From Swiss-Prot:
Pfam families reported for this sequence: PcrB (PF01884)
Function: Prenyltransferase that catalyzes the transfer of the geranylgeranyl moiety of geranylgeranyl diphosphate (GGPP) to the C3 hydroxyl of sn-glycerol-1-phosphate (G1P). This reaction is the first ether-bond-formation step in the biosynthesis of archaeal membrane lipids.
Name of the protein in question: Geranylgeranylglyceryl phosphate synthase
GO cellular component terms, semicolon-separated: cytoplasm
Annotated compartments: Cytoplasm
Cofactor(s) listed: Mg(2+)
Organism: Methanococcus maripaludis (strain C7 / ATCC BAA-1331)
HAMAP family membership: GGGP_HepGP_synthase
Chain residues that bind Mg(2+): 28, 53
Length: 256
């Protein structure tokens, strides 16, 4: 049985095709002000991704609330096998390709697969790549990431190419939540050129100017999380920069 591209992924592909780039906002369900964040971003984000540790409030309840508040596609970004709920629209079905621990490469997604099928969730097959300085962040520590050095962009490119050969349609270049600096432009460009699949970039993107650069370098999706928690109003300017970069990129590509 061949898994077909679902409604959420089709919608996202259309946004990328028409706008040149999409903007995802990451909401940690453990944040007490997740309702406030959802209200602030609903008119600016193209999709919401939910990820992080789960505290007192259940993931089911948080996901349902965020869907009701925003009216946007809600995509799970699970930190482990328990980070799945039937209330979501889709899930980033991912492998942390450069983890030193096979649990994060293959065991965790395998353990979660039956639950995802049971819930009827749409899957977005994705390679998750930990990029320097991710080892200094929580995800780098927990995921035992063998981080890809920023000065070796070709390594990320080859991983991305490998992901495309495995049939994945998305690559997430992740510097880590609250990272000191983002994934560099050359690495984004090489990853896009070699793989030809959708490139998501997150971690350390704090200004609209940096987001613009990342899109022009080849990013199809920009993700912000920590920024959104600290300054929900910043998403308005971030969206403007991402969409401007997307249109500028489309114009540039049309001339080639």
């Amino acid at each position: 049985m061949q898994i077909k591209i679902g409604e959420v992924e089709s919608k996202l592909n259309k946004i990328i095709e028409e706008d040149g780039a999409a903007y995802f906002v990451l909401i940690d369900p453990d944040e007490k002000n997740y309702r406030e964040i959802a209200n602030h971003v609903k008119n600016y984000a193209d999709a919401i991704i939910i990820g992080g540790s789960i505290g007192i409030i259940s993931l089911d309840e948080v996901t349902k609330e965020i869907k009701e508040i925003t009216g946007l596609p809600v995509i799970l970004f699970p930190g482990n096998v328990d980070g799945v709920t039937k209330e979501a629209d889709a899930v980033l079905f991912m492998t942390l390709m450069n983890s030193k621990n096979t649990y994060w490469n293959m065991t965790a997604p395998t353990l979660g697969a039956l639950t995802i099928k049971k819930y009827g969730l749409e899957t977005l097959p994705m390679a998750y790549l930990g990029i320097e300085p991710i080892s200094k962040t929580a995800v780098g520590f927990v995921g035992e990431v063998n981080e890809i050095p920023q000065k070796k962009p070709e390594i990320a490119g080859i991983y991305s190419l490998s992901a495309s050969y495995f049939g994945m349609r998305w690559v997430y270049l992740e510097a880590g939540s609250g990272a000191e600096y983002p994934v560099n432009n050359e690495m984004i460009g090489i990853s896009k050129k070699l793989s030809g699949i959708n490139i998501i970039v997150g971690g350390g993107i704090r200004t609209p100017e940096v987001a613009y650069e990342k899109v022009m370098s080849g990013a199809d999706v920009i993700v912000t999380g920590t920024l959104t928690e600290k300054d929900p109003e910043a998403v308005k300017e971030m969206k403007k920069a991402i969409k401007k970069a997307g249109m500028d990129k489309l114009k540039m590509l049309s001339k080639k």
